[in-house]
Amino acid sequence: MKDRVRSLVAEGIERCFADGSLASNQMPAIVIEKPAHAEHGDFACTVAMSMAKAERKAPRVIAETIVKHIENGESGIIGGIDIAGPGFINFRIKNEAWSRTLAVVEAAGASFGRSCAGEERKVQVEFVSANPTGPLHIGHGRGAAIGDTICRLLSASGFDVTREFYYNDAGAQIANLALSVQSRCLGIEPGDPRWPADGYQGDYIKDVARSYLNRETVDAGDQHVTAAGDPNDLDAIRRFAVAYLRREQDQDLLAFDVHFDVYSLESSLYTEGRVEEVVRRLIENGHTFEQDGALWLRTTDFGDDKDRVMRKSDGSYTYFVPDVAYHLAKWERGFTRVINEQGADHHSTITRVRAGLQALNAGIPQEWPEYVLHQMVTVMRGGEEVKISKRAGSYVTLRDLIDEVGRDATRFFFLMRKPDSQLVFDIDLAKQQSLENPVYYVQYAHARISSIFEAACDRGISVPSFPDAHVDLLETPEEIELIKLIGSFPEVIEGSALSFEPHRITYYLQELAGAFHSFYNKNRVIGEGKELSSARLFLLKGVAQVLKNGLALLGVSAPEKM
């Protein structure tokens, strides 16, 4: 509807140019917004203010000129146009025009809300990317929900999306993992003086050790690893432990309905020589220096607050060097747009990774890649914070939440706040089967509509299709509000996708569910006469479709019974 209003304004301005009423002959950007107050109409346009300088006229005079040239016609969508204040053009849409939105929803079905805004442009989204050193924690879970939903939103907006998981399967943390598993294999427990200083203490380490000693075989992605069973073969333990925990993380993500197109391994950057090649190019480009036996990168040349060590005096690389190599590989794979969804604790790495990429002189834009950073999650039960999982040892796992409150509630709750806002996950609320639980509130609206359809069927009343639905009878404030909300769904999707803000979908669905509950509490659907019942059933058919489509974008089910 907003696009149709924009087109009417543009056509009116073209007529002004054609007859000389406006002199600039340059079409301005036409912004159509929802007014802050309902009494000002359905849409407002500020184009007259933006044209004032070029036209050398008062905005209100320009607005009056444009309005005179807008041709709506008897069958048009505009029910009224007002000019307010210094030159706001306010539009009121005819009820019958709003009602026709329902026919669009019916025709599009599961595709309603999707657009071609992305024009099939390639976008790579990297998310989760957990170290394979233990079960996924709740921070990974929030990142998985946000990243996965961003992918769904971008796909719905016409982008060609590649989902990628980067395994940090090299470095000090993996060495600590291997030592921890080896210690368990040898019967050494935490607290023993022989236990590794930075060892992992969760019960899952015992599980890995037991499987290793039993010479089990693990399949993880393209890896097929059979345990050697030798507690003294640290390299064999490392390979098995990484594969074992990769498999566990993959199973957790599958339970969370999160899937990836590409899995990349940090270790492959070393075996393929990519890390050494990046270091060679950085040295060759003159952006490095040696000091105290270490190799440094002059990241201050590219906006960092201090220079950074690349290669330590012992010959090992700091973690951001393989990150630079990995992102160069992304660029070389043709991804001119990359979005990294990460925890806020990775904020400090952004500047140095971008600095390394700039120092390569590879033609990579300064602000590439883009980042979405999520804040921490606090889990509450009975008014107290939950901090420990027996299996993980020191943190609450994603699997803990899924097992306790279910996938739907876990995903919805993770998505209810803007990524850069801290999130309190109330387990008690997530388990409630009441309208106080946000995900239950939305799902119940869908289930309630299904029960209405079932009741209609029991009375021999079928849910109609357009044009037999008598939508012209839909005129109560609650009915029109529902239709307006339904009509705004495509815009909500596109806005959420382009801003990387999935929480907008949760807000929208709660608003739509609330509008439905308000409508249902004030209006009878069945028993108000055949034609009005038909119209209201058709309205609810549209509401149910949009609720289902919106929940699908969040990876949440739309049950028909609850």
Swiss-Prot record:
One of its GO terms (cellular component) is cytoplasm. Signal peptide: none annotated. Transmembrane segments: none annotated. Disulfide bonds: none annotated. The keyword Phosphoprotein does not apply. Its EC number is 6.1.1.19. Keywords: Aminoacyl-tRNA synthetase, ATP-binding, Cytoplasm, Ligase, Nucleotide-binding, Protein biosynthesis. It is found in: Cytoplasm. It catalyses: tRNA(Arg) + L-arginine + ATP = L-arginyl-tRNA(Arg) + AMP + diphosphate. The keyword Translocase does not apply. One of its GO terms (biological process) is arginyl-tRNA aminoacylation. A motif ('HIGH' region) lies at residues 130-140. InterPro entries: aa-tRNA-synth_I_CS, Arg-tRNA-ligase, Arg-tRNA-synth_N, Arg-tRNA-synth_N_sf, ArgRS_core, DALR_anticod-bd, Rossmann-like_a/b/a_fold, tRNAsynth_Ia_anticodon-bd. Pfam families: Arg_tRNA_synt_N, DALR_1, tRNA-synt_1d. NCBIfam families: argS. Belongs to the class-I aminoacyl-tRNA synthetase family. Monomer. PANTHER family: ARGININE--TRNA LIGASE, CYTOPLASMIC, ARGINYL-TRNA SYNTHETASE. This is Arginine--tRNA ligase. It comes from Geobacter metallireducens (strain ATCC 53774 / DSM 7210 / GS-15). The lineage of its organism: Bacteria, Pseudomonadati, Thermodesulfobacteriota, Desulfuromonadia, Geobacterales.
